[in-house]
Amino acid sequence: MGKRVVLLLAHGTPNTVDEIPEYLRNVVSGRAMPQHVVEEIQHRYSLIGEPKGHSPLTELTMEQGAKLAKRLGEPVYVGMRNWRPYIADVVKQMRADGVTEMAAICLAPQNSRTSVGLYRRAALAEAAGMQVDFTEGWSEEPLLADAFAERLRPAVAALAAETGERVQVLFTAHSVPCRTIQAPAVSDGQPILWPTLKQDAEGAPNVDPYAVEAKRTAAMVAERVPEAAGWCFAFQSQGASGGPWIGPAVEATLEAMAQGGVKAVVLQPVGFLCDHVEILYDIDIAFREFAAGLGIELRRPESLNSSALLTEALAKLARESFLRLDEATARR
C-alpha cells in the first residue's frame, strides 16, 4: 500500500519587509511592480505583527497543518504559492518521501481561477506518478460556517454592549480583477445583500464561481448569528493592477451604511482562515479608521487561526478526499 498524505495549499507571505519585492514579483508572475506600490506594501507590513514588519500567516498555516495531522493521524504537508515553502518544493519533497497519494486542499474556501486554479496547477506540475484528489472548493461546508459563527457571535455581543447600538455585520472576501472571473464591476457603492446572490447565481455558467461562493459562505454564517441586526457583503483589498476589480469596496459600503444610520459594525472576512496583512492592516487599521471618520464603531472577530472547528472542517474534507482516492483505486 502506498503512502497517503494531505497537502494544504496557501497563498504565502514574506517573513520580513525586505523580502516584499521578491514576494510581489511572485504574486504578479514576475512582472515588475511600480516602486510606489512596493513601498506602500512595505509600509503596511511595517505596522503589523510581533515583531513589527512580520506577518504571522506562515506560522499560523503551519500550526493549522500540525493540528490537522494530529486530528487525522496522517501526515500533512503545507505548500505556498507565492513564498517559501513553495508548493513545487514541497511536492518534490513528498515524492522523495515516498508519497503516492495526495489529498490536496486549498486554504481558500471559495473556488476561483485566481486561487484554487493556480494552486492546482502548481501542485500537479510536480506530482507525476501520484494519485491526486483536489478539493475544488468548500465554501458551503457547514463546519466552516460554524467556525466563523463561533468567532462572530461574541464580537457582535461585545460591540452591542459597548455601544448600546444594534450591530450590523459586514462580511468581506478579497477582491479579484474582473477580468479573471468575467464579472462586471459593481461601482454604485450599494451594499450587496442576500437577494443579489440569487441574481448572481443565474449568470452565465462559465463565470468564475468565486463571488457567488463568497456570498453563500456569508449567508450561512449570518443564519447562525441571528442576534445581529442585519448583514451585507463587500469585497476588500482591491489591488493596484490595471482594470476594474469586483466590488463594491468596503469603503463604499461603509459610506452607504453610515448614510442609513448604522453606528456599529462587526466586519468579518469569510475568505481568510488566519491573520495576515489584509486583516491586521486593511481591517484593523485602515477600515477601522475609515469607519471612525463616518461615525461608525467597527470591530473584527478573532480570526479562525487555530480554531478547533476549522480543524474539524479540514479533517472532514481530507477524509472525503481519501474516500475518493479509494474509489479511484478500486476502479483501476
Summary of predicted features, one role per range:
Residues 1-332:
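Active-site-proximal alpha-helix that buttresses catalytic centers in soluble enzyme cores
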